[in-house]
Amino acid sequence: MSLITAGIDIGSTTSKAALWVDDRLGPCSIGPSTTNPRATARECYEKVLQEAGIKTEDVACVFGTGYGRAKVSFADDNISELSAHGKGAKILLPSARTIIDIGGQDTKVIIMDALGEVLDFGMNDKCAAGTGRFLDFIARTLGVSVKELAKLHASASYQPASLSSMCSVFIESEVINLVNEEVPLAFIVQGMHQSVAIRVAALAKRMGLVEDVVITGGVAKNAGVVDELERKLGIKVKTFPDGVDPQMVGAIGAAVIARQKHLKRSGKQA
């Protein structure tokens, strides 16, 4: 009989659930976070159970993580986002030593040792610039969807518009001015991605970047931001195996840690 564990990651903008079945990744679920994190966690969990065709009693252990981890009322325990992302990234990409997690409302840089233990971390949670919310905000200003940003970035020659401000409020004014000056949308998007990369790269360099580097969070799906980060860091960012959603890394890590804790408590080896 398979040993199934679950990880629930309640983030600021999205909530995720992942199942770990024996030594492999099982079904995953993702949806928007709401003002009722308890209900959101339950809904996300039930969705992934339904996809797997199992019941709650079939899951040996559940761990919560993310901003809303304390609201995962059915969890056996919870862990920090740092530990969850560290474990998730390491199990998916064993060579990973630095994680750049660009979330909805903050950016984290996590440095790990060869075993995946967190050595150091840094966070930018004081300003929206350099986060997923910033990209959402500017995309709305431009009248496009977030999913269109990467395509726009690659749709023209590389001529990023200059955005002098590092504040999201002032950048909005700059973007509006650029639109009024009829600067091509692709160049504005390139400039916006460059602005995000400058802020994130500055944090990463302060931390003392160690390769291999991997990006997690929803912004990791934006090839334009990844391209700009590689330019600013001067390295090639690694990617997870095909089919693995970079937004799921925290939930996956929580599920793996849940398995390890369950085996330890039951006197078995992980």
Where are these regions (language model features)?
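Glycine-rich phosphate-binding loop plus the immediately following alpha-helix
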Residues: A114-S155, V256, Q260
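Conserved phosphate-binding/catalytic loops in two-lobed NTP-binding clefts
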Residues: E81-L82, E230-I252
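Adenine-nucleotide phosphate-binding core of ATP-dependent small-molecule kinases
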Residues: I171-A204, Q247
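Gly/Thr-rich phosphate-binding beta-strand-loop-beta motif of the actin/hexokinase/Hsp70
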Residues: M1-R24, R97-G116, Y158-A161
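Short glycine-rich, Thr/Ser-proximal phosphate-binding strand/loop in the N-terminal lobe
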Residues: I4-A39, E43, K47, V118-K126
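Short beta-strand-loop/turn "lid" adjacent to the catalytic site in phosphate-handling enzymes
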Residues: V21, P27-S33, A52-S83, I110, ...
